[in-house]
Structures are given as structure tokens and as C-alpha cells.
Design a protein with these regions (language model features):
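Patatin-like phospholipase
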Residues: 1-49, 54-315
């Protein structure tokens, strides 16, 4: 689909990265718009993975970014209904969820191995114990948006049995609701329960790739902006392994972007700058850092607004 405004990209890709990843991405989008840069909410298409699927759904469902910011930063009385039930539980089991997140990152890095990675990924998924928690309260929040598959929204997940990627919005539109697709995309293996739909079982889309940027579509003159909070060190993982995993995630994202660029697509990938990385801290699931992470994202977006605004200004 074409963008809905002349200063917006054709496609916005919103990657995984936990609750703080969503907070940072929301802040960046707000900062870009406030500073006169591209309006990400008016993109023609959104591709969301894990936390990015929440943000993509909120945007296409009509939730203003400023309102989402208030919910994430706790300034609204409904913040607890969407953030705390999930991430308060995570805070009580930091070791378990960080191990799950580290495993997720490792599986995403497997894509660098090529076609054989599918078999390794499937073996990994079969060895991971089924998660004990669910994201039902998040599903209720998505349901209240009343959103159907409208052509603008794509959400990624991975089939638990085959370890293949699925793209809701391209497939399963008759058998999987938008809310179930979001829950599937956020179902971190080993922590959250897998999500069933259309006769199949799904887990976090980040198992395949934290951004799934390659789905953005390519072609001469197309424009893509990817907000990617992933690729930083995960707390609780040995330093060397963490560095290797983070490097693999960044390399995979670079390869995905390079493929689009070879076909003539303009791709802009935005990652947390130094200040935002400090705000996010060592764990992307730390809900006590939401407000400062949103603020850091806004500041980063404001800093990028002028240069990106020139790139996306009407001819």
C-alpha cells in the first residue's frame, strides 16, 4: 500500500525488544513527528515482530502515539491494564525470562547459517519447556481496538512444529484474529505459552528474526524505515556469548537491509543511540525504566527529524 501522507515511508518495520523496546520505538516516532520529520503513523504498511507487533497494531488501530506514550510511562490510569500484568510477573522471575530472551536471540542468529538453520531452530524449539504465563490481558486490550486485517498490518510469528515463519495479514486472515496474532508474535519460548490458531501453534516472531526486515518489499523508489531496539547485550548471559549473539542479530539486520537496497529500496534502520541505550539498561523487560526510555526515544527522534524530514519531504 502507498503511504497515507507524502512525508511518510511506504513501510515501517517495528522490531522486537521487550517492553522497553516498544517504549523506545514509541518515543522515536513521537520525536520524529514533533521535529518535522516523517510521520511514521501514516505509512502504507507496518510489519511488527514481538513488541513491535503491539506498536504496529496500536497505530493501525488508531491509538495516537501520545496516548500510547502515556500508557507506557504510567501517566494514565489504564497503564496498569496493558503493561503491569505482564511485566510485573516478568520482574518477579528475572532469571527465567532473561534465559528465555537469550535463547530467543540465539535462535534469531541461526538465520545466518542459511537453509540448515531451520532444522536447528526446530530442534531448539522442541527442547525448550512450554512457557507458564499468558498475555491474555494484552489480548483484551487489542480486542478493544476492534481491528481487522485491513491490508496495512503484517505480524510475524513462527510455527512451533515446523519452525517456519508465518506472516499474519498475508496468511491466516480468516482463522487468526489480530489480537491472537499479536499474542503469538510476543510468545517468548520458555516463558509465555504458545498461541494456537488456524489449527497450528505459534511462538514469538523473533525466533526467526528480531526485525523481519526482509518482508518490507523492494523496488525502485520504495522507502522503508525500521526501528530496531534489538542487538544489544542481554543481561544474565556470559559476556562473550552475549557479544556474539548481539553481533549476529546486527549482521542479520544488515543483510536483510542490504537485500532490499540491492533492489532499489531506500532503507533507514534506527537503533538506540548511546543515551537511549543507557536509559534502556541491561534488561529490556524492566518496567521501572519505561518513562526514561520513552523520553530518550523522543530526544533521539527529535535529533533525527531534520535529516530524515529532508529525505521524506514532498518533491
Amino acid at each position: 500500500m502507498d503511504p497515507l501522507a507524502s512525508n511518510s515511508p511506504d513501510t515501517v518495520v517495528l522490531a522486537g525488544g521487550g517492553t522497553l523496546g516498544e517504549a523506545w520505538m514509541t518515543g522515536v516516532a513521537i520525536g520524529l513527528k514533533r521535529g518535522g520529520g516523517p510521520d511514521l503513523t501514516m505509512a502504507g504498511q507496518f510489519i511488527g515482530t514481538s513488541a513491535g507487533s503491539i506498536m504496529a497494531t496500536m497505530i493501525t488501530g488508531g491509538t495516537p502515539l501520545e496516548r500510547r506514550m502515556q500508557r507506557l510511562s504510567g501517566d494514565s490510569d489504564i497503564a496498569g491494564a496493558e503493561v503491569d500484568p505482564t511485566y510485573t510477573r516478568i520482574g518477579r522471575e528475572p532469571g527465567r525470562v532473561r534465559r528465555s530472551a537469550a535463547g530467543l536471540a540465539a535462535m534469531a542468529g541461526l538465520a545466518l547459517l542459511g537453509p540448515g538453520s531451520r532444522f536447528i531452530r526446530r530442534a531448539f524449539l522442541r527442547r525448550i519447556p512450554e512457557g507458564r504465563h499468558d498475555l491474555g490481558r494484552l489480548g483484551e486490550s487489542i480486542d478493544r481496538l476492534g481491528l481487522s486485517w485491513n491490508g496495512r498490518l503484517r505480524i510475524t510469528a513462527v510455527d512451533l512444529e515446523s519452525a517456519d515463519r508465518v506472516v499474519f495479514g498475508n496468511e491466516f486472515t480468516d482463522s487468526v484474529s489480530v489480537s491472537d496474532a499479536v499474542l503469538a508474535s510476543c510468545a517468548i519460548p520458555g516463558y509465555f505459552r504458545p498461541v494456537r490458531g488456524g489449527g497450528r501453534t505459534f511462538v514469538d516472531g523473533g525466533v526467526w528474526s528480531f526485525s523481519n526486515l526482509d518482508l518490507a518489499g523492494s523496488g525502485e523508489g520504495r522507502t522503508v524505515i525500521c526501528l530496531n531496539p534489538a542487538g544489544t547485550r542481554v543481561e544474565g548471559v556470559p559476556r562473550l556469548r552475549a557479544a556474539i549473539t548481539a553481533g549476529a542479530i546486527r549482521l542479520l539486520s544488515w543483510l536483510e537491509a542490504a537485500k532490499l537496497r540491492r533492489d532499489g529500496t531506500s532503507v533507514t534502520v534506527i537503533r538506540p543511540n548511546a543515551e537511549a541505550a543507557v536509559a534502556i539498561g541491561p534488561s529490556r523487560m524492566d518496567s521501572t525504566r519505561l518513562e526514561e526510555t520513552v523520553s530518550a526515544g523522543i530526544a533521539q527522534g527529535l535529533g533525527l527529524a531534520e535529516s530524515l524530514g529532508q529525505r521524506f519531504s514532498p518533491a
